[in-house]
Regions:
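Ankyrin-repeat boundary/"N-cap" motif
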Residues: 4-11, 35-47, 68-75, 101-108, ...
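Ankyrin repeat A-helix N-terminal signature
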Residues: 13-18, 44-52, 78-84, 111-117, ...
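Conserved ankyrin/ankyrin-like repeat signature
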Residues: 22, 53-54, 86-87, 119-120, ...
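Ankyrin-repeat and related helical/solenoid repeat scaffolds used for protein-protein interactions
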Residues: 104-163, 167
Length: 193
């Protein structure tokens, strides 16, 4: 029997149900590493938020804990995108790479920094995320986490952004040369209110 390269369209709902037997039936005719065709990201099974039981089943089936989607993002990148940081420690425990880089050369910590929640950044660093990482993308150029924090230069997020900046700097993150320009722009926005 020839195995499918793609996952059933309702795979995310099946995983959400937490029913390991239903998932086993749904993927029995799928290759290891099969992807979701309807997604621009070409998500693999490990990319969907899942219970420990589902995660264990998928790993026992042979799925890769560090599988890559179309943009080279890993399941840990995916958990950041889905705002399911609570599942990251288990992925790390099972071999997930918290410092894996995607096609933009960014680690999952860049995604957490983008949401500007210092408590989440602190968790990621405690779990092993490197705050000193510098992404070097052909599309976006070089980016430090401190620079990425201020890239939108929004006064509305200034308090949260500055909390994240302070946290990153306290953990040895390099300073981006664009920070002073971003801070001046945020201050200019503040003065116009």
């Amino acid at each position: 029997m020839r195995l499918r390269k793609t996952l059933p369209a309702d795979i995310e709902q099946i995983i959400d149900s937490g029913d390991v037997e239903a998932l086993a039936r749904a993927v029995q005719r799928c290759e290891i590493g099969a992807y979701l065709r309807s997604s621009a990201f070409e998500l693999r099974l490990m990319h969907f938020p899942a219970s420990k039981q589902i995660t264990d089943f998928l790993l026992e089936r042979g799925e890769d804990i560090n599988s890559r989607d179309h943009y080279e993002r890993t399941p840990i990148h995916s958990r950041v995108w889905y705002s399911r940081l609570d599942q990251i420690p288990y992925l790390i425990e099972r071999g997930g790479d918290i410092n894996a880089r995607d096609s933009s050369d960014q680690t999952p910590l860049f995604g957490v920094v983008e949401y500007k929640r210092a408590s989440d950044v602190e968790k990621m660093i405690a779990w092993g995320a490197d705050p000193r990482v510098v992404a070097d993308s052909q599309v976006y150029g070089k980016a430090t986490l401190t620079g990425y924090t201020l890239r939108r230069r929004s006064f509305v997020d200034s308090v949260r952004a500055l909390e994240v900046m302070q946290l990153l700097l306290s953990h040895g993150a390099p300073v981006d040369e664009r920070i002073s320009v971003a801070l001046e722009e945020m201050d200019r926005q503040r003065c116009t209110f």
